[in-house]
From Swiss-Prot:
GO terms for biological process: translation. SUPFAM superfamilies: Zn-binding ribosomal proteins. PANTHER family: 50S RIBOSOMAL PROTEIN L32, LARGE RIBOSOMAL SUBUNIT PROTEIN BL32. InterPro entries: Ribosomal_bL32 (IPR002677), Ribosomal_bL32_bact (IPR044957), Ribosomal_zn-bd (IPR011332). This is Large ribosomal subunit protein bL32. GO terms for cellular component: large ribosomal subunit. The lineage of its organism: Bacteria, Bacillati, Bacillota, Bacilli, Bacillales.
Amino acid sequence: MAVPKRRTSKTRKNKRRTHFKISVPGMTECPSCGEYKLSHRVCKNCGSYNGEEVVSK
């Protein structure tokens, strides 16, 4: 079984992990109520999507 010959340094480990991060979700402002919502989803505050009321409150 293969075993590492040298210990991986902190610098090398951190360089490898530079792309290992969480991306920020795409938030847009709701045109109906002005609250921030996830893109391409129904607004949780007013229940509208694409300018139409989809969920009645």
